[in-house]
Amino acid sequence: PLCLETIALYSAVDREGKRVVDLGCGEGRDVIQFAREGYEAVGIDISARGLKKAEAWAKKENIVISTIQSDLVSFRLGEEFDVVYSSGTLTYLPQDVRRAVFSNYKRFTRQGGLNAFNVFVEKPFLETPPDWGIDEHFYISGELLTYYWDWEIVRFEERILDCNSGGVPHKHAMDVMIARRV
């Protein structure tokens, strides 16, 4: 998974004191994993219920995380992080706000820090997933790279994944990118 791959880019010693923000953390799977690995971890999500579950899970494991309830469209970073991370939730950003949002993420990433994202990509040969919401927006292939042309691209891949969300078998196309501020 992208979370573990991102964690592996810093040695255990280098992780101490590093800050990560998980944009769209849901019920906390990845933000808790980052905290387990020594990061100061902050989770952002629109769902109060999801954040409460993340906080309860962290407490049960004796792990400290911070949470902020916000939608991703209006949320902007206001402090620096070593890792800005999101898995599958940047699809809620409409195309017209993306440039400004990614500029904000870049501005508040520390020198040498990482932005690690995966986003759903529209492909004409794949049907729209059955559980795709009206507030979800596809990216085009390689779009993430256009926002990070001035950073080191550590990894970029496009893949097609089998999925069974909503109980209906289907496929997703996804771009995965890890970029480093140099």
Predicted regions and their residues:
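A conserved beta-strand element that flanks and buttresses the S-adenosyl-L-methionine
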Residues: 85
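Class I (Rossmann-like) S-adenosyl-L-methionine-dependent methyltransferase catalytic domain
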Residues: 1-17, 21, 26-76, 95-100, ...
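Short catalytic micro-motifs in class I SAM-dependent methyltransferases
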Residues: 88-89
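Helix-to-beta-strand junctions that scaffold the AdoMet/dcAdoMet cofactor pocket
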Residues: 94, 109-110
